[in-house]
Regions:
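Active-site mouth loops of central-metabolism enzymes
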Residues: 1-7, 49
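C-terminal extensions of enzymes
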Residues: 140-176
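Alpha/beta enzyme core
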Residues: 7-24, 31
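Shared catalytic-loop signature of beta/alpha-barrel
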Residues: 21-24, 30-150
Length: 176
């Protein structure tokens, strides 16, 4: 819902989602609507996921400890990288919540998010965009492929397990 719905609209939609057995209801309310998010999460069976736009550990902790979400979705590129996101995931794990990183930009972020999630005991999934994106698929010499909802990681390669296509980097290069 992209943090754009009113509480009443989110509740109404959430009850329909409950009947349809929808897996997640992502970011129904504003990120800073802690009371509304907690009440919504309490009143629905559909799990509330969020908030990819949040960037601070302290605010994620407030969302988690206040039971405003059921699934935490930090974006590694926005929320402080691996180190800060591991702290966020640890707070979520301490509250028996899953972590599902958000990865909607380049192939590098997707690789980082996949490896990050794979290394978590409470890693649920990675939210990734399946639309065409030259910086996601084209940037990698060997793009990730989802098969039946899963992406297999190659543990024989170092680091993030990716190699960048220099011709694509050249295409987007800007001299400053």
């Amino acid at each position: 819902a992209n943090a754009a719905w009113s509480f009443s609209d989110a509740l109404r939609a959430g009850k329909i989602f409950d009947d349809l057995n929808i897996y997640l209801f992502e970011e129904p309310l504003r990120t800073d609507d802690y009371a509304g998010s907690a009440e919504l999460a309490n009143r629905l069976n559909t799990r509330i996921a969020g908030y990819e736009t949040e960037v601070l550990l302290t605010n994620f902790a407030r969302l988690i400890e206040g039971r405003c979400v059921d699934v935490v979705q930090p974006d590694i590129s926005w929320a402080g990288g691996f180190t800060e996101c591991r702290k966020i995931a640890a707070v979520a794990e301490a509250h028996c919540m899953e972590t599902a990183p958000h990865a909607f930009s380049s192939g590098i972020l997707l690789a980082a998010s996949l490896h990050f999630s794979a290394g978590l005991s409470n890693g649920a999934m990675v939210e990734l965009d399946m639309t065409e994106n030259g910086l996601r698929a084209g940037l990698l010499k060997e793009p990730f492929k989802a098969v039946n909802g899963y992406v297999e990681l190659d543990d024989t390669k170092y680091g993030l397990g990716i190699e960048l296509d220099e011709s694509v980097i050249e295409k987007y290069r800007v001299e400053l």
